[in-house]
Amino acid sequence: MSGSYTQSVQNLIDELARLPGIGLRSAERIAFDLLKQTPERALKLADAIRDVKTRIRHCSVCFNLTEQDPCEICVDPARDQGLVCIVEQPKDVLALESTGLYKGVYHVLLGVIRPLDDVQPADLTIEPLMARVAGGTVREIIMGTNPTMEGDGTALYLQQLLAQRHPQVQVTRLARGLPAGSSIEYANRNILADAISGRQRM
């Protein structure tokens, strides 16, 4: 069936099917829905995709997604620069910010250590984190990685690394209100608020 599509339609379907969670059938449905849209509406989507790829970058300090560098959180004078919460992905920052409780800053690892997938510590933003801590303003690191095998393993690795390089820094972990194997980005904001306020020393 797909072999009868024009080349431009087939290209669109192929590109849509590359997106996570979108199979060939879903890509076909989306492609034909776009074809039904007015040119103005379809081009508005194209403009939004172009804008996000040209304007969004990683903050040079915390590696969160931002349109300015450093990001708004990093330059906010009301934020406690001595309190750094380590998370896996930018989506986790949004989840923790939704609580309205956390007043520190963040460091986004952009992943977790996954030896089986050949994701090593050097592939994450761990060395920039160590450089940040070496600056002398950080007094507490909160491990906000997900309560998964990989998230816990990454947190343990970081704890040991911090103990070796910066033993003066207190290392804590979000309280275990989150179910094992869950993701911070999907957690209820009340659960996240409790996890922040009830954090425990590692």
Role assignments for model-derived ranges:
Residues M1-S4, Q37, R41, D117-P121, ...:
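Catalytic cores of large soluble enzymes that bind and process phosphate-bearing ligands
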Residues S2-V9, R18, S26-V93:
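Cys/His-rich Zn2+-binding cysteine-cluster or related metal-binding knuckle/ribbon modules and their
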Residues N11, R41-I49, S60, E72-I73, ...:
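Core recognition of P-loop NTPase motor domains used across DNA-transaction enzymes
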Residues E15, L19, Q37, V52-R55, ...:
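Conserved, well-folded catalytic cores of nucleic-acid-processing
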Residues Y102-K103, M130-M202:
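Long C-terminal interaction/binding lobes of large macromolecular proteins
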Residues Q10-D14, E28-F32, L43, D47, ...:
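Solvent-exposed alpha-helical segments within well-ordered globular domains of core cellular machineries
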Residues A27, V75-I142:
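Extended interfacial segments that mediate partner engagement and assembly in macromolecular machines
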